[in-house]
Amino acid sequence: MSSQPSFVTIRGKAISLETQTESLLSKYSTFAQTTSSEQTGQEKKIDKQLEGILGQRQDVIDSLTQICDSNPAISASKLSQLHRHKEILQDHWKSFRNIRSSIQQERNRLNLLFSVKNDIANSTTDAPAPIGDADEYIQNETRRIDQSNNVVDRLISQAWETRSQFHSQSNVLNTANNKVLQTLQRIPGVNQLIMKINTRRKKNAFVLATITTLCILFLFFTW
């Protein structure tokens, strides 16, 4: 009767599969930079390999988990190694899905641009546009869209920065104003002096308004 594989043996397989996954992810990411209108055979192959190897790694981790659960005296270092393998698997799944999504988004955008190009060509002439011209148009439109997105991002960033500066300056002015008022209130007689100045200004304004009114009435009755 064959004995069950040890923790070290199964962990060695997990490490080997992790290395293979990283190599496949590196190859798979190149398709996001050179996306074609349709999925190539090589892209399909790597996509399928990644799904398969990630599934194998889950089986390996399940085996390691079973060994740890069945052995209460398992060392803390092995439990830590198992936890790390789980984290790496989650990270690789996340990277795989992100790359796949990026490839699909880029492919959809290229197909949309190509469709627009064909519609424009069909509306002007019945002759099909040369493939070289279509590729050049797609590349130019892609660059133009990227440049527009960069400009919008910069404008939004500048707007938020300006808003933050205004908010910061407003807080500084409010703080300074509060400090001045607090300081004036601590100085004896300052509040009374300010009240007297305001009262005197009101009296002067009242006298000036009265004189102006009398002059207008005098001119009105003597004209």
Swiss-Prot record:
GO molecular function annotations of the record: SNAP receptor activity
- The residues exposed to the Vesicular compartment are 223
Null allele outcome, as annotated, is: Lack of late Golgi SNARE proteins, TLG1 and TLG2. Spores are temperature sensitive and fail to germinate at 37 degrees Celsius. 10 to 20% of cells possess a variety of aberrant structures, including fragmentation of the vacuole, a common occurrence in secretory defects, and substantial accumulation of membranes in some cells. These structures are considered to be abnormal Golgi remnants. Endoplasmic reticulum (ER) retention defective, erd phenotype, which is characterized by hypersecretion of ER-resident proteins. This results from a defect in retrograde directed vesicles.
Give any Pfam family that matches.
Answer: V-SNARE_C
| BP GO annotations | endoplasmic reticulum to Golgi vesicle-mediated transport; Golgi vesicle transport; inter-Golgi cisterna vesicle-mediated transport; intracellular protein transport; vesicle fusion; vesicle fusion with Golgi apparatus
Q: Where are the transmembrane segments?
A: 205-222
Alphabetized UniProt keyword annotations: Acetylation, ER-Golgi transport, Golgi apparatus, Membrane, Phosphoprotein, Protein transport, Transmembrane, Transmembrane helix, Transport
Q: How does it sit in the membrane?
A: Single-pass type IV membrane protein
Q: Which domain of life is it from?
A: Eukaryota
Q: Which residues carry this modification: Phosphoserine?
A: 164
Cite the ranges annotated as topological domain Cytoplasmic. 2-204
Is Hydrolase there in the keyword field? no
Task: Indicate where this protein resides in the cell.
Answer: Golgi apparatus membrane
Please tell me whether the keyword Protein transport is annotated for this protein.
yes
Task: Using the record for this protein, list the coiled-coil segments as residue ranges, or answer none.
Answer: none
Please list the residues that carry the modification N-acetylserine: 2
List the record's Gene Ontology CC terms alphabetically. Answer: cis-Golgi network; endoplasmic reticulum membrane; Golgi cis cisterna membrane; Golgi medial cisterna; Golgi membrane; SNARE complex
Similarity field: Belongs to the GOSR1 family.
Assembly state and interactors? Component of several multiprotein Golgi SNARE complexes. Identified in a Golgi SNARE complex consisting of t-SNARES SED5, YKT6, and the v-SNARE SFT1. Interacts with BET1. Interacts with BOS1. Interacts with SEC22. Interacts with PEP12. Interacts with self.
Q: What does this protein do?
A: Involved in transport from the ER to the Golgi apparatus as well as in intra-Golgi transport. It belongs to a super-family of proteins called t-SNAREs or soluble NSF (N-ethylmaleimide-sensitive factor) attachment protein receptor. Rescues alpha-factor maturation defects.
Its protein name is Golgi SNAP receptor complex member 1
Originating species? Saccharomyces cerevisiae (strain ATCC 204508 / S288c)
